């Protein structure tokens, strides 16, 4: 089953686990950066 965000609570899923794991880490880091940036702007 596909996850629109490219990752799940259990971890990344894909045909190529190495590829998807790399994409997942990149996405999560990007989301964290946006979240921190948003908090700085709000607070």
From Swiss-Prot:
Keyword Ion transport listed: no
Alphabetical list of PROSITE patterns matching this protein: NGF_1, NGF_2
Annotated localization: Secreted
SUPFAM superfamilies with a match to the protein in the record: Cystine-knot cytokines
Key words of the record: Growth factor, Secreted
Pfam families, per the entry: NGF
GO CC annotation terms, alphabetical: axon; dendrite; extracellular space; synaptic vesicle
Gene Ontology terms: biological process: cell surface receptor protein tyrosine kinase signaling pathway; modulation of chemical synaptic transmission; negative regulation of neuron apoptotic process; nerve development; nerve growth factor signaling pathway; neuron projection morphogenesis
Record InterPro entries: Cystine-knot_cytokine (IPR029034), Nerve_growth_factor-like (IPR020408), Nerve_growth_factor-rel (IPR002072), Nerve_growth_factor_CS (IPR019846)
SMART domains given in the database record: NGF
GO function term, MF aspect, one: nerve growth factor receptor binding
PANTHER family noted in UniProt: BRAIN-DERIVED NEUROTROPHIC FACTOR, NERVE GROWTH FACTOR NGF -RELATED
Its job: Promotes the survival of neuronal populations that are all located either in the central nervous system or directly connected to it.
Protein name: Neurotrophic factor BDNF
Source organism (scientific name): Raja clavata
Gene: bdnf
